[in-house]
Amino acid sequence: PYTTLFRSNSNTSGTSNTPKEGPETISDGHCETTRETLSPQFSVMTMNCRYGRADAAEIIRNIRERNISVLALQEVTDDLITRLTEADINELLPYHQFGDAKETDNGGFNVIYSRYEPSAAVPNVVSIPAADVPAITLKTSGNRTVTLCSAHPKSPMRGCADWSAGILGLRELARAKSVSNRNIVVVMGDLNSSTDHPSFRALLKSGFKDASLIQAAGPNLTFPSWLKWPRIELDHVLFTPGQIGR
């Protein structure tokens, strides 16, 4: 899994991820928060579940140890949802939005879970030639909002045209009129691309920042995960300016 810690701050922007540093505990004790208001600091995690074969217990362990507030999953199946439910994911992240499952999905549907109650949620926030992109909007202090999405464009093996179109289609999220320093968008998922690919570079130019690049500590190599040393960075947490991480 790929995790990122965000810290709300209206005057600066940036973020960093923490997968190489181990779990980081976040305390809400010094600030007023409710189930309806996102903490000023929060961790997110994204994971490709590989045709729904992911270990539900391992996902739950990561949620607990990394104090995850928002979880994005890709390639999800009904069976995995059942196993996650039996493992009490709803006790940790009681709110969720699923993308609608379709025969054309690439490996499964996408899901987003949250510790906090969304002010809005949709099963598909942008149309791309791939699985639906579910999204939730969370309120933060200071009348700010964060819209978080779980995305999974198709791989080039499923056709280069759809591969590129899926990545480029996510640009619409950064270009939305509602996006501002106080209303940001976070896209998480297996984007099947990296800075080596022109389509991904075009996605960044549309207004997104990449948490991995902001950290400036080298790429987070996540694929293929079954190798001892993964060689490619395909999983990303992208965001529009308006947040800071450490």
Identify the role of each PLM range.
Residues 41-54, 154-164, 223-226:
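Acidic/histidine-rich helix-loop elements
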Residues 94-112, 194-246:
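Active site of divalent-metal-dependent phosphoester/diester hydrolases
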Residues 49-52, 77-80, 102-105, 119, ...:
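Solvent-exposed loop/turn segments at secondary-structure junctions
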Residues 42-49, 59-85, 147-151, 169-203, ...:
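Active-site beta-strand/loop signature of hydrolases that rely on acidic residues for catalysis
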Residues 68, 93, 118, 182-184, ...:
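Local beta-strand N-terminus motif with an aromatic residue
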Residues 8-36, 70-153:
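Structured beta-strand-rich core segments of catalytic domains in phosphoester-bond hydrolases
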Residues 2-5:
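Short, small-residue-biased leader/transition segments that mark boundaries at the very start
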Residues 53-57, 130, 231:
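Structural motif corresponding to alpha-helix initiation and N-cap regions
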